[in-house]
Amino acid sequence: MKQPYNTALYMRLSRDDESYGDSVSIETQRTILRRFAEENNLHVVGEYIDDGWSGTNFDRPNFQRMMQDVEAGKVNCIASKDLSRFGREHIMMDYYLEFVFPEKGIRYIAVSDNEDTEKGLSDFVPFKNLFN
C-alpha cells in the first residue's frame, strides 16, 4: 500500500507575473492544485501562498512556513502548478529537488509540467529550471 501523502499546495505569484493575467493567478493555481489533489487522493493539509514574491527569492514567508511544516513532519508531499511557481532560481531549485526532498522523503509534484519525484523527474527538469 502506498503511504498516505499529507500534501502542501504551494502557490506563488510575483508582481512581474501579474502581466500574464489569469493564467497564473492564485485562484487559477488553487483550482488546478485542488482538482489534482482530489483526483489523486492526496490529503491536503494546507495551502501556502506567497503573493507578490519573486521566485528567485527562497526567503518567502509562506515557503519558509511550508518548509517548517516539512521539518515538523506535517507535510510529506508538495504540489505546485508548475516548476516556476515553486521557484525560478535554478541552483536552489536543484538543491531542493536533488538533495532536500530526497533526504526528507518528500514527494514533489509540478502538476502542469507533469513532473513527479515519485515517478522520477524527467531529464529536462534542470533545463526547465535554467529557463524559468
Model-derived features with residue positions:
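Short, structured surface patches at the beginning of a domain
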Residues: 1-132
